[in-house]
Amino acid sequence: MKMNQLLEAFWYILPAYFANSSPVVLGGGTPIDFGKKWRDGRRILGDGKTWRGFFGGLIVGTIIGIVQYFLLPEYYGSLGIAIELAFLLSLGTLVGDLIGSFIKRRLNMPRGYPAVGLDQWGFLIAALCFAYPVKTIPTGEVLFLLVITPLIHWGANIFAYKMGWKKVPW
């Protein structure tokens, strides 16, 4: 795989990365599950998933796509496609993260507890699925993202921890 293909894969997924990380800074407030519990007596999602974080991530990810369009318009072809793709990547990311939290609560994993694989790939796979109708990337680029995303995820978590945005470095 050529370097420009690796950069293109990274460029493609950038709105998802921003949507996934921005709730750490923008979140707080009312939990998406409103404090309700599932049939197993555990919270549906937990306090870490809030409406402010969800919509903040959606907005930030979409804005990243708009900025990308103005930096490299030929990649998207139109502003409308850039907005649609960034929105779907961001929405998929956030929905994938919610699904991951739901699964973690069912497994009785506490908030913030690392779930290797689920935390790193759940949002990525959901983002790629949501964006599929608008724009896809070659299989090699998807595989590259599956390899690089855990490294970026862990690095971003350590950075957020050192900045005081997260209580734990994972």
UniProtKB/Swiss-Prot annotation:
EC numbers for this chain: 2.7.7.67
Pathway(s) per entry: Membrane lipid metabolism; glycerophospholipid metabolism
Transmembrane listed as a keyword: yes
Name under which the protein is recorded: CDP-archaeol synthase
Membrane topology note: Multi-pass membrane protein
Subcellular location: Cell membrane
Xref: NCBIfam families: PRK04032.1
GO cellular component terms, A-Z: plasma membrane
Cofactor(s), names only, from the UniProt record: Mg(2+)
Domain of life the protein comes from: Archaea
Name of a matching Pfam family: CarS-like
Function: Catalyzes the formation of CDP-2,3-bis-(O-geranylgeranyl)-sn-glycerol (CDP-archaeol) from 2,3-bis-(O-geranylgeranyl)-sn-glycerol 1-phosphate (DGGGP) and CTP. This reaction is the third ether-bond-formation step in the biosynthesis of archaeal membrane lipids.
UniProt keyword Lipoprotein, yes or no: no
Known catalytic reactions: 2,3-bis-O-(geranylgeranyl)-sn-glycerol 1-phosphate + CTP + H(+) = CDP-2,3-bis-O-(geranylgeranyl)-sn-glycerol + diphosphate
Record keywords: Cell membrane, Lipid biosynthesis, Lipid metabolism, Magnesium, Membrane, Phospholipid biosynthesis, Phospholipid metabolism, Transferase, Transmembrane, Transmembrane helix
Record lineage: Archaea, Methanobacteriati, Methanobacteriota, Thermococci, Thermococcales
Family, as annotated: Belongs to the CDP-archaeol synthase family.
GO biological process: one example: glycerophospholipid biosynthetic process
Organism: Pyrococcus horikoshii (strain ATCC 700860 / DSM 12428 / JCM 9974 / NBRC 100139 / OT-3)
Transmembrane segments: 9-29, 53-73, 79-99, 114-134, 140-160
Gene, per the UniProt record: carS
Entry GO MF terms: CDP-2,3-bis-(O-geranylgeranyl)-sn-glycerol synthase activity
